[in-house]
Structures are given as C-alpha cells and as structure tokens.
C-alpha cells in the first residue's frame, strides 16, 4: 500500500536533487542565459528542457545501476552518505571557485527553431557523463534508491527530479529576462558563487549530521 508520507518524502528529495543537478552554471547554464538575453526567455527555457531530459536519462541510468547493489547500499549506508556529502562538498567548492564566464561562446544571431535550441542543449549535456558521479553522490546522500520500491514510487521520484530541474530553468530564465538590462558577466559570476556557497552549506550540514549519526534529510 502506498503511504502518503513516503510519496511526500520521495517528492521533496527528487525535487531537491533536480535543482542541485541543474543549478551550477556550466556550459549549458551559460548557454541558457545567453539565449534568454539574445533570443528571448522561451528560447532559454527550451534550452533548459533539453538539459533536463539529458539529466533524467543519466538519473535513470544511475538508479538502475545502483538497484543491482541494494544489499551493499543497505550495509554501507553510513559510508555512502558520508561519501555523498563529501562529493557534494567538493562539487560546491568547484562551483564556487569556477568562472562560468569562460564558457561563454558567440551565439548565432539567428534564433533557430525551439526544437533546434532544445536538441543542442540536450546534446551538450549528454556529452558530459561525469554527471553520473554527481547523481551517485546525491542518491546516496538522500537515500533515494532503496529496495522494495513500488513502480509508482520510482516513477514519482524521477518525475520529481524532472520537476525540480524544470523549476530551476523556469526560474532562472524568468529572473534573467526581468533584469536583462542590468544582467552582465559579473552577474553570471556572482550567481554561480551563490549557488556554490549554498551547495557547500547544505553538504557541510549533511556531513556533520552523518558523522553525528543523525539524519538531516
């Protein structure tokens, strides 16, 4: 029988995972902002949709792979959550110290079709399989993959990841579009540092609580 509390737990964990995966301004994030500024908000948003679809593909691949080692996961949940927190902390530090402005490339003056903007973002994101390690860390940290999960619960979890990712892209394109006259290269740099700082803060708390034997999430 499906428990409401279980569904709610899956929903919020999946949503947070989707946001964390999408938020750092890597090549696709910068591309999304560029297209929002140069072509319009919805061109930026479909760029985010393309990135989200690729992320979901990697999330499914990661979850499927981890499903074969349930016994190992259950027996070593402490170490896996510790690993997940450390990996997220490293990811946050990298994001904080990186300069996304270096990823800026000239954008074609031609808007192109929505599908073209979607598929190019999908391809760029798909070309970075290292995101699997981020999903492993997140799934371990949030205990997202567990034994005996119903199909409905699994589908709900991955849909929540997609919703979190899409919410981020919808929000960032809305924000950039609203402040387009004031948004510059320094704005991109500052936004990325804020994101990195938040990820470091959350992962730091997770690391401390794990070492204390408590559950932060």
Where is each model-derived feature located?
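Alpha-helical transmembrane segments and their membrane-interface junctions
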Residues: 132-144, 206-215
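Short alpha-helical packing/oligomerization segments
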Residues: 150-166
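Membrane-embedded alpha-helical segments of transport systems
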Residues: 50-61, 127-129, 161-169
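Membrane helix-loop-helix hairpins that form the core translocation module of multi-pass transporters
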Residues: 42-117, 175
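Selected transmembrane alpha-helices and immediately adjacent juxtamembrane segments
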Residues: 2-3, 116-137
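Juxtamembrane transmembrane-helix termini in multi-pass membrane transport proteins
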Residues: 2-78, 137-155
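Selective transmembrane alpha-helices of multi-pass membrane proteins
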Residues: 73-103, 161-172, 176, 183-217
């Amino acid at each position: 029988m499906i428990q409401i509390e279980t569904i709610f737990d899956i929903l919020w964990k999946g949503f947070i995972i989707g946001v964390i995966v999408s938020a750092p301004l890597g090549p696709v994030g910068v591309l999304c902002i560029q297209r929002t500024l140069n072509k319009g908000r919805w061109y930026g948003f479909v760029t985010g949709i393309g990135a989200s679809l690729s992320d979901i593909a990697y999330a499914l691949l990661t979850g499927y792979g981890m499903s074969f080692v349930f016994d190992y996961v259950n027996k070593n949940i402490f170490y896996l959550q510790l690993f997940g927190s450390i990996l997220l902390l490293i990811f946050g530090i990298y994001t904080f110290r990186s300069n996304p402005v270096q990823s800026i490339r000239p954008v074609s003056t031609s808007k192109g079709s929505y599908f073209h903007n979607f598929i190019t973002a999908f391809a760029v994101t798909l070309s970075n399989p290292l995101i699997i390690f981020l999903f492993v860390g997140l799934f371990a940290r949030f205990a997202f993959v567990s034994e005996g999960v119903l199909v409905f619960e699994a589908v709900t979890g991955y849909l929540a990841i997609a919703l979190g990712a899409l919410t981020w892209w919808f929000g960032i394109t809305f924000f950039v579009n609203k402040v387009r006259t004031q948004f510059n290269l320094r704005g991109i740099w500052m936004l990325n540092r804020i994101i990195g700082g938040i990820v470091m803060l959350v992962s730091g708390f997770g690391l401390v609580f794990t070492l204390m034997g408590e559950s932060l999430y």
